[in-house]
Amino acid sequence: MDHSVLNVLVCPVCNSNLHYDKENQLLICKADKLAYPIRENIPVMLVEEAKKLTLEEVKKYG
């Protein structure tokens, strides 16, 4: 994932900055507790494709 792209992407729900989880290829919105997938180096910024974070995952990402 190109870090210059990360600097301009925000959560489509609340416009918050996103945290890049390189290991799991996810973009995390801590505010909305959503994880957007990255597929073939392309962020999928559709709310319908986002995964709601579990309580354990929320704690992991802070």
From Swiss-Prot:
Which Pfam families has this protein been placed in? Answer: Trm112p (PF03966)
Could you say which residues form the signal peptide?
Answer: none
Q: Tell me a GO cellular component.
A: cytosol
So where does this one cross the membrane? none
InterPro entries in the cross-refs:
Trm112-like
Q: Which domain of life is it from?
A: Bacteria
Which SUPFAM superfamilies has this protein been placed in? Trm112p-like
Q: Which family does it belong to?
A: Belongs to the UPF0434 family.
Read off the PANTHER family from this record: PROTEIN PREY, MITOCHONDRIAL (PTHR33505:SF4), ZGC:162634 (PTHR33505)
Descriptive protein name:
UPF0434 protein Fphi_1862
Which organism does this sequence originate in?
Francisella philomiragia subsp. philomiragia (strain ATCC 25017 / CCUG 19701 / FSC 153 / O#319-036)
